[in-house]
From Swiss-Prot:
Family membership noted in the UniProt record: Belongs to the eukaryotic initiation factor 4E family.
Function: Recognizes and binds the 7-methylguanosine-containing mRNA cap during an early step in the initiation of protein synthesis and facilitates ribosome binding by inducing the unwinding of the mRNAs secondary structures.
GO cellular component: eukaryotic translation initiation factor 4F complex
InterPro entries membership: TIF_eIF4e-like (IPR023398), TIF_eIF_4E (IPR001040), TIF_eIF_4E_CS (IPR019770)
Positions with biased composition (Acidic residues): 27-36
Organism: Oryza sativa subsp. japonica (Rice)
Subunit record text: EIF4F is a multi-subunit complex, the composition of which varies with external and internal environmental conditions. It is composed of at least EIF4A, EIF4E and EIF4G. EIF4E is also known to interact with other partners. In higher plants two isoforms of EIF4F have been identified, named isoform EIF4F and isoform EIF(iso)4F. Isoform EIF4F has subunits p220 and p26, whereas isoform EIF(iso)4F has subunits p82 and p28.
Protein name: Eukaryotic translation initiation factor NCBP
Amino acid sequence: MEPAAEKREAEQEELQQQHDEPAVPSADDDEAEAEENERRNRELKAGFHPLRRRFVLWYTRRTPGARSQSYEDNIKKIVDFSTVESFWVCYCHLTRPVSLPSPTDLHLFKEGIRPLWEDPANRSGGKWIIRFKKTVSGRFWEDLVLVLVGDQLDYSDDVCGVVLSVRFNEDILSVWNRNASDHQAVMTLRDSIKRHLKLPHSYLMEYKPHDASLRDNSSYRNTWLRG
């Protein structure tokens, strides 16, 4: 077997290992859940339709060729929302992917999670990656946003957020999850994404753990799994 093939096989075996023990709910988790329940009750009384979680939309616009720019410094919060009504107000005012400059990223994440590899919620996780022609990316992005906000993905508690990356020749959608070593959760999430987006069989999905992205300083190169 060639060294490159051996490396890929070893990486995939590493991804399939499940070392993490089940998380034990903490007092902070209980407090956060109580706050969420209180928030939903307030919104119901006000006549709104509360989402299960509050979400934050972030925007990144990097200047081509400006390598000295800090990625974290470039991430700007646009808005947050927690009801169906506030979501649609926000979404209807967003610029559509076809009109966004390259390179640009839109990040829709659960409140409390920043769209950074180093964030505590993301550090042990990874992302599923799907590449689209620019002519069709807008429809799939909208479907993915609705699936996330509607809490429809399998292993939804393991999902951190979704990203639209507008590039010169293509647009890329990615779904970030918390635990790259939980092979069952990773593969079930892949199947759930395919099902909800109604992806044609010709579309290839790639997976990359965030620690690998940190090592090679790249979001979308050198992916581990394909399927």
